Amino acid sequence: MHSCSHTHFVSFKLPHFFAPKSFVVSSRRELRVFAVATTVEEASGNIPAAPISLPQGSWKQIAGGVTAAKGFKAAGMYAGLRAAGKKPDLALVTCDVEAVAAGVFTTNVVAAAPVVYCKKVLETSKTARAVLINAGQANAATGDAGYQDMLDCVGSIATLLKVKPEEVLIESTGVIGQRIKKEELLHALPTLVNSRSDSVEEADSAAVAITTTDLVSKSVAVESQVGGIKIRVGGMAKGSGMIHPNMATMLGVITTDALVESDIWRKMVKVAVNRSFNQITVDGDTSTNDTVIALASGLSGSPSISSLNCKEAAQLQACLDAVMQGLAKSIAWDGEGATCLIEVTVKGTETEAEAAKIARSVASSSLVKAAVYGRDPNWGRIAAAAGYAGVSFQMDKLKISLGEFSLMESGQPLPFDRDGASNYLKKTGEVHGTVTIDISVGDGAAIGKAWGCDLSYDYVKINAEYTS
């Protein structure tokens, strides 16, 4: 914790985020979590809050984000990396022990320096001790000089933490083509290291520090049991624009105190990413910097997980899925210029992958997204997007519902209350709620979900004005 005389950054908790099946806020985009400078005394009682909607499960949501699990500390601070303002722009997450590490990265061939570095490190190392994240400069397309800047930062933070350089992973977000402001970053590192704690406040500061065009910070943690022992899984993420499978301008750090072997952990993280971050879309752009780093300290005392085919693995996978899906939905909800979250559920396929592919196609459709923003219950656009997903299904099995309104049955349009359906879209947008689209394509048992947001005039304005 900072001393009470120091500037501290917190996020205000907005009321009424949660509803039985979706989350809402009471006044659209004006009421959001935002960073403010205050003292710790003044900040008392303000905890990190983002509109996180978790799936149903045996876990309970708790405070703490990345510091909820045993062995983890975090910090966030302003280091002068952003173009303007005093919002935190440098974050650090550390583990007291060697944490089993996994990473999932962008599929963009124009990969940023930190992506190249992390992939290389994790090819030979099973563990990590720290993740350093900067906002402001993406350090993508910066050549050898940008890569060396990053190595210098890694070396400096490793020295301060008294760990090996290869135990430090790094993530960057910001303007493509700009190198890290190395001098400012290096100057800030001693303060950042000394600011670390396992407090909720520092977890929140870190979550704020990694944001760019985000209007809310995203942080969540859950508590459950693995093998009868209490474990925790927490995480933070950033993302608002350039969000499209596979992953997007999306950074994430996931932590757990469960004990799990390296190869199993990496497979579990990949599965969870495929069910969450790879199932969200805002604008169809895939970033150069996508990174999710997941660390497992093993300090909970839970049984070691050495196989995917055991009850303990299923218990941990469920918690991991829940945290990542909660963060992913929050990112889509916070899509640039958006007025609502769109949740697409597809049933009736033979495999989960097929259902997920159709759901992703519908959630990604610019025409569907524009129709939702225009409050137009356009079943034709939904049907078309499902049809071009690349998954074969029988037309006469197709069913489509929008909220409580059935739009299509047996591949044929149904008479429905168009004004009522339009009003459903309007009212959902007014409270920045969740529009649900349910699709059935057959008799299979598989289910897949995807999340997106509507496409508004403001999206164009925000990105037209974003600096290059």
Swiss-Prot record:
Transmembrane parts of this sequence: none
EC number: 2.3.1.35, 2.3.1.1
UniProt-listed GO biological process terms: L-arginine biosynthetic process
Modification sites for N-acetylvaline: V36
Domain of life: Eukaryota
Reactions catalysed: N(2)-acetyl-L-ornithine + L-glutamate = N-acetyl-L-glutamate + L-ornithine; L-glutamate + acetyl-CoA = N-acetyl-L-glutamate + CoA + H(+)
Residue numbers marked as site, Cleavage: A248, T249
UniProt keyword annotations, A-Z: Acetylation, Acyltransferase, Amino-acid biosynthesis, Arginine biosynthesis, Autocatalytic cleavage, Chloroplast, Multifunctional enzyme, Plastid, Transferase, Transit peptide
A GO molecular-function descriptor: L-glutamate N-acetyltransferase activity
InterPro entries the record matches: Arg_biosynth_ArgJ (IPR002813), ArgJ-like_dom_sf (IPR016117), ArgJ_beta_C (IPR042195)
Main location per the UniProt record: plastid
Subunit details: Heterodimer of an alpha and a beta chain.
Function, in words: Catalyzes two activities which are involved in the cyclic version of arginine biosynthesis: the synthesis of acetylglutamate from glutamate and acetyl-CoA, and of ornithine by transacetylation between acetylornithine and glutamate.
Family under the similarity heading: Belongs to the ArgJ family.
Protein name listed in UniProt: Arginine biosynthesis bifunctional protein ArgJ, chloroplastic
Organism the protein comes from: Arabidopsis thaliana
